[in-house]
């Protein structure tokens, strides 16, 4: 049986940070309030563009896999914040990398994007349609955020993460012990779609929609999302495990969407998982939507949280609403085959200067 195995991983965490202390100066809040309710201490802010972050993460992932861009069959960019509507971010990334043999498309499932992209990659590999797929989760969320709205501004950060999936069909390895994706689950419920909305960037608005602050900012109903997300991720993980012929007792590590520490811990507790079985990096990254799982996976591998042969679970819940989970058995290698010096350009501004345009644009909503 042909399975999709992760052979490379990488991330791009922007060098600028928006700390809780910074937010105390921008909005009526406090470090204690934010940390207690979200688990976040700081979040990355990008001074460049979405594709710049995606390229950095992708080059690190390709180096880790020991591959060249020309080895790729497909690029899937998971994002709700592309630079432009057309060409797709994936096509722009293909050009940047020189991945001339790769098909490319964008996928938008909000915070569930990387899981949706991973299931798509694994399915295409299992079907024999592709053999080497780059999945990138990337978001530049700060430009959608009203930094006087404490319900949203304390949560979100910018960043990118990437994973290379390759076909593994070694005839000498029995299917029962072979590495790769073992089970998946995807779902959606459009009835609850109003809990997270980005009104602009769509055909519904007028051409002048970017001049309308109310219809340009991210709308997020935190309490409603909390209730749906905990139940949704639990059910999704259980379905994916069942399809893999496993139970929660077989799980070595869960790498969840870093939505909110309370959501993650509530879901983990109900699944019977210990703290050591759950990867969290939200304290220093914030909620980076589609980028959060691959960024957390990168950190898990860098800190020896993933061991050869481990059963690893990705799970996410996002706007749409969407949800999904992936169960996979890790291969023998947890070290990079190579490294890359790819990085964003040096920062030439402060975080206050970066966010000045946001604050000016959304100011009429608070007069």
Residue locations for each model-derived region?
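Conserved beta-ketoacyl condensing-enzyme motif
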Residues: 6, 46-109, 115, 248-264
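Short beta-strand segments
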Residues: 7, 78, 108, 133-139, ...
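Acidic-glycine-rich active-site phosphate/pyrophosphate-binding loop
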Residues: 25-33, 85-98, 135-141, 203-211, ...
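Condensing-enzyme catalytic core mediating Claisen C-C bond formation in acyl metabolism
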Residues: 1-47, 149-227, 231, 235, ...
